[in-house]
Structures are given as structure tokens and as C-alpha cells.
Amino acid sequence: MTTLADLTTLRVGGPIAEYVRVSTTDSLLEAVRAADASGGPLLVVGGGSDLLASDAPFEGTVVDVQPFGEIASIIDEGPSGSVLVRAGAGTVWDQFVSWTLSHGLSGVEALSGIPGTVGASPVQNVGAYGHEVAETISSVEAYDRLTGNVMRLAPAELGFAYRSSAIKRSVGQPGLGDRPWGPTGRWVVLSVDFRLERSPLSAPVMYAELARRLGVEAGERADASLVRSTVLDLRRGKGMVLDPGDHDTWSAGSFFTNPILPEAAAATLPEGAPRFGAGEGLVKTSAAWLIDHAGCGKGFHLPEAGDPPCASLSTKHVLALTNRGNATGADIEALARAVRERVYDAFGVTLVPEPVTVGIAW
């Protein structure tokens, strides 16, 4: 029997009642409609890289979305160098980024190395090194589970926010019958259109560490291919590029989002805590800094996790919770709760987990 541990980068999760593997838009639609007709819960999985599942059986349907064929295609190109590109939901995200550069296009190179699929990118509004995918998304083709229609969602309808979207926020809202949406939300992504630029130069480099490595000032542009290779090097150094032989990469990536606090709450943080403007009256701080300064450094683990531990923070990056080889969903959940409690006790800040959860409520 297929388990969620087989489908997630954390490699934890219980058995699946109904497992369906799809590799076309039509088969994806058919599987989702059948699952909704059955009355059970639905989980659509791409790379499984932003998912934490409990060890309990999932009494519903899991739809495992595979690549649809070609990585992407150019839909339209304007005289100013603006290029519209379409990629199917099952396309591996990093293969898409590589494809854009091989076709002389820039705009998503700073998002190199992020695991998962194109279909998941707008749901989470994936981001890294000063950029978010929302900056380049022109529209999303999605199946509306409420109306049964395929529709195209514009950015205004997608409601992008920090590591969030209207699709993600629909989870838990009233859904079919008397059941809330979840674990997959109201809309199932079928394809994504991106507005990119035909240029050898990257989007402006906005992340200080990346700018230093590239030898440019923040806000300047650099060779797009060099940005990609540098980002991949940085991510590897933090255990953020999937490697089956490296347990530091058996994770869901950055597990907690950076807290966005009212100015008054941010003012109570220690003087050394990072602070970034996040809109009127709001301040963003660093989850990694809070975790580290709450006594949860690299490699932190609970005593009951064993020796060597079955689950710990990455030895390279405190934001990643990792499976050291034989962890269960309960082990990862316990570690996450312990880190949250320590940060709250130290700073009065409640960290928000980023991954989609199955059978776990915070």
C-alpha cells in the first residue's frame, strides 16, 4: 500500500486509502471529480516538499500529479522582450527554471532549487532570495471544485501574500456539502502562465547575501545563469537542495515563516533581532534568528528522539526540521511543537508552520 511517507520529502506519513497517479490534465480533472463525488477528503500532491503528514491512515483520495509532457511552452512574445510562458501543474519546478534560462528568459532564476512542482508554486507563493513567484505569474488555470468549472485566475483573484494565496487560504473554509476544504483547497491548479523577460540579465538582485556572492550591489542585475548557479550553491550549503544521501535535505524546507508583527510587538524583541519593514505599522523579523536565540541551534533535538536522534533541526540551517532516517510524523510534529514553545517562551512570538498538514492541527 502506498503511504504518504512515499510521496513526501520529509518521508513521513501514514497509509493512503485511495491512491491515483495522473500525468495529464484530463486525468487530473477526472481524479479530482471522482474524489469529490465519493464524499471523502482530497489531497493533491506534486513533489510533496511542503507537506507534513501524521502517521494515521488518510481516509480519502491522494492524487499524485506527475509531469504532463513538455516542460513548458512559449505562448506569446511581445516586441519589448516580454514573453508569456505556460507550464503544466506537474512540471518539476527547478526543471522549469532551468528551461527558462536555456530559452534565454529571466525572472525566476532566484527561485532555483526550490523543490516541488509548478502547480504548487502559486498555492504557497513560493519565494527565496528576495523574490516571490507572484512577481512573474500572469494567470493560473484551475479547476474550481465548488462550481465544477475550469477557470483562469488573474493575480488579483489569487490574492497573493507572503507564502500564501487565496488557494491556500481556502483550506478550512466551507466546501462541498457540510465539509470544509482540505487538505487541498477549493481550486486545483492545472497550469500556470508566467510573464518573463527575454534577457541574459536576471531580475534585480534583492538579497544581500546573494548580492555579495555575485559581486553586485543590491538592486542591480547580474548574469541570470550565474544567479541560478550561485543560488544553487547557497541552497546546497544550507541543505536546501534535495539529496537522498544527505539527511539534512529530508525536510519540508523552511518549516516556519518569518513572523510579521505589529510595530509595538516588534519593539519588545531584543536589540539584535532582525527587523524589516512589512507595510504600514508592521515589521518582519527572522524566524531563524528567534529559533537560534531561543536555544534551538543547528542539530537541536528532543531527548526522547534518541541517540543519534530520529528527528532534529538541520545541522546546516535551523529553519529546517529533518528526518534523520527513521522518524515518524509524530517525531517531526513533537519537534515542531517544542521549537514553537521555546520561541514563544523566549520572545512571546508564535511561529507559523509553512507546510500543508494532514492529520495535524496546530
Protein language model annotation of sequence segments:
Residues 16, 71-75, 114, 137, ...:
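Weak global preference for isoleucine
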